[in-house]
Structure formats: structure tokens, C-alpha cells
Amino acid sequence: LIRNNDIESFSPERLPAVTRFPMPPEMSAPGRTLTLVCTKEYVYAASGGDLYRLNRETGQYVLFASVGGGSCVIRDVMECNGSVYVLTLMDGLYECDGNGRIGRYFRLPLEYEKSAGAKELHLDSQGIIWVATQSGLLLLEPLTASTQLLRSDLHYPYSLPNNSVWSIFPDPDGGIWVGTYGGKLAYMTFADNGVDYFKATPGGLNHPIVSCFEEDDAGNLWIGTEGGGLNYWDRKNDR
């Protein structure tokens, strides 16, 4: 986690011990948005449009790549097929090689003639990258660089419930949970092109804005909302 301009790391087995990695002044300068992303291989720390890799043995931050303009904000980072994908809030998606050199750039969908805000990345079991944006769900095939934008369509029952996608979470049954801003919770299964909706109801989902998910060891789904607190879905009893 990031706290007081430091990255802090701890293990539940070794509490209350906390390891701190102080950020250099250029990373924590006023006005720069800080983002922390942990992959299987690296710990990434973003400051504005600058992306650093943290060496956990030495505590040093090494500049990996710089993307976007002066007001750029990095939202998420993903490693796929030897490439590193860097998602920004408003400046698009960048593909870098293992050394941080930018190779390809993918523009985000437009909303009201401006680039739509982006939220996060997800890599599915078929190798497709899902990009959550506030103007739809962008699907990217890394090998061919082809993209497809999924948007809400009132005339098509299996479309997204809302174009503003805030969160994506894989389900162990093979589907994908998609949280939207005010447009219900969606469960997508591309095997049968199905989309199930879960709207805010008494005794069910208590708020339509879903911002994050997490799954516990028993397979139950914890659903974080913007204004409705934390929801819990009992998978075994389907409630």
C-alpha cells in the first residue's frame, strides 16, 4: 500500500512488522497522482505519467517508462506475452517492451468528443485484454492489435447494462463480473453470449455503483460499492 509517500509491505504471518520503501522526492512531488500495481513479477509505482519498478531487495525505484502528457495519470499496469501494458486515465493505453520502450498505442473510446476515463485492465483465460472505460468495455486482442468496443444497447438484451464500466472480476466458473456506474451489476459469459443483470433491490445488491470485487477462500464474492458499503454474495446458497 501507499501511505505518507512510502510504499509499505506486510505479511499477515509476520505482523506487526512492516517494511517501508520511501519514495524519492521527484515521485512524491505535490500534484502528482500516485498509483501502486503489483504483478507476479514486479512491483510498479506510478507518479503522474512516470512508471517505476521497485527493487524490493535494495529499495530503489528504477524509471521504467514515461507515458502521456504533463497531466497524465496511470491507472493500471498488466504484463502479457512479454509486453507491459500501461493504462492511463485519459491518455490511452500504451504497450511497452520489457525494457519500457513504447511500441504500440491504443486510443480510448470517445465520450462527448473527448477521451473517456479508464479504470482498469483484465486479462482473460483466452488472452484477451479487457479495458474498463467510462464509455464502454474495450476488448483488445494483443497478437493482432484488433479491438472491439462493447456498449449498452437498449434494443439488444445481451449488451452491457451501462457504458460506464468501473470494475472487472473473473469468476471461477468461467464468467466475468462487470461493475458499472449506476447501471446494475453484470455477469458475462462469452461461451453462450449471455449477460445476466443484478440490480439494486431490497435484500440483494444495495447500490447500483459497483467499484471493486474480491473473492474469499470459500468462493464467496465481496462487492464494494460507491455509497452502499460492502455487499456479500454467498455462492453456495446463491444469496
Where do the language-model regions lie?
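Carboxylate-rich, polar loop motifs that coordinate divalent cations or form catalytic acidic clusters
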Residues: 1-239
